[in-house]
From Swiss-Prot:
Alphabetical UniProt keywords: Coiled coil, Membrane, Mitochondrion, Transit peptide, Transmembrane, Transmembrane helix
Protein name (database record): Protein FMP32, mitochondrial
Pfam families, sorted: CCDC90-like (PF07798)
Gene: FMP32
GO-annotated cellular components: mitochondrial inner membrane; mitochondrion
């Protein structure tokens, strides 16, 4: 493209140009442009207007590149500042969150201790109530066992008395039955003896 603009030969050699970096496009200064133009005329066999055009084009290109680089550097500096500010803000936010977490953790810990103490009191109260209930139940059970034992002993005595009465009644009935049997036997013997005497008397009368 450069060859088409200034009508340059097919191959030319150029030397690098030193420059100073400023803060914007207007402050970029490239020294010794006339020296480079003279070198192009002497060594490159360019005409003066061609050398001037080449130097101006190269100067504009270098200034544009320097301006672009300076803008990138400025953006990078702004990004660095922004990154630093974000780190600072993040550190503040982290400190605030940590402080809030500590405060919340402290509150939760206090609530936990309060609930723990309440549960301990409730457990002790329940233990006392259970102990009292068990003691009352054991006392009632012991009294009930004693009452049942007394009633059982009383029932045993009544059963023994009834058994004794039954045995006495059975013995009396046996004695009465034996007495009746004896009387019946005596009566039968008397009847048989009388009958036998009557038969003998009747037989004597017949003879």
């Amino acid at each position: 493209m450069l060859k088409r603009i200034v009508g340059l030969p097919a191959r030319r050699c150029f030397h690098r140009t030193s420059f100073l970096l400023g803060s914007d496009f207007e402050t970029v200064h490239i020294p010794n442009t006339n020296h480079f133009k003279d070198l192009l005329i002497e060594n490159g066999k360019f005409q003066e207007d061609q050398a001037t055009t080449i130097v101006e084009i190269m100067t504009d290109a270098i200034r544009g590149g320097v301006n672009h680089v300076s803008q990138d550097l400025a953006k990078r500096e702004k990004l660095t500042q922004l990154s630093y500010q974000q780190r600072v803000d993040f550190a503040k936010l982290r400190d605030q969150l940590l402080s809030a977490d500590r405060s919340e953790f402290h509150n939760i810990q206090n609530e936990y201790e309060s609930v723990k103490n309440d549960l301990e009191k409730l457990r002790n109260k329940l233990r006392e109530e259970i102990t009292k209930t068990n003691a009352g139940f054991k006392l009632d059970l012991s009294l009930e066992k004693g009452r049942i034992r007394e009633e059982s002993s009383h029932h045993d005595l009544q059963i023994k008395e009834i058994d004794t009465k039954i045995e006495q009644e059975v013995t009396n009935m046996k004695m009465q039955i034996d007495s009746v049997k004896t009387q019946v036997m005596q009566w039968l013997i008397g009847v048989c003896t009388g009958t036998f005497a009557l038969v003998l008397a009747y037989m004597r009368l017949l003879t």
